[in-house]
Amino acid sequence: METEKSSYLEVMGEHPMNKVLDFLLTFDEFDYSLTEIAQNAGVSYSTLMLFFSKLEANSIVKCTRKVGKSKMFMINKENPVVQDLIKLHWQIAKQEMHKELKKEMVVV
């Protein structure tokens, strides 16, 4: 079963980093282990490890707590770059929604 791509991924492309950002921006109220991030974003753990340290070093994500040996992470909403990403994420969603509404108006 193929899952439907988000509007964000339709516009920005399906690069693994975009998939991770899309997941973290969409589900921004909770923190996740690296394994959960990889699974929910649809990327392999080894691929996530190629770039996740850059996201952490640039404060795009932040470590929120430690559960056993696992660190938990979430998107860092205090970072101005992330705030701009959130705005972009919503703008893309709004744009796609308007496109769909126009299609429905034409069909009806």
Task: Describe the predicted segments one by one.
Residues 18-23:
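Pre-recognition alpha-helix immediately N-terminal to the DNA-recognition helix
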Residues 25-30:
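Short helix-capping/hinge SLiMs at alpha-helix to coil transitions
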Residues 44-45, 51:
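Short coil turns linking two alpha-helices in DNA-binding domains
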Residues 59:
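Glycine-centered, phosphate/nucleic-acid-interacting loop/turn motifs that mediate DNA/RNA or nucleotide
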Residues 62-63:
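Short beta-strand "wing" residues that participate in macromolecule-binding interfaces
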Residues 80-108:
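Amphipathic alpha-helical dimerization/coiled-coil segments
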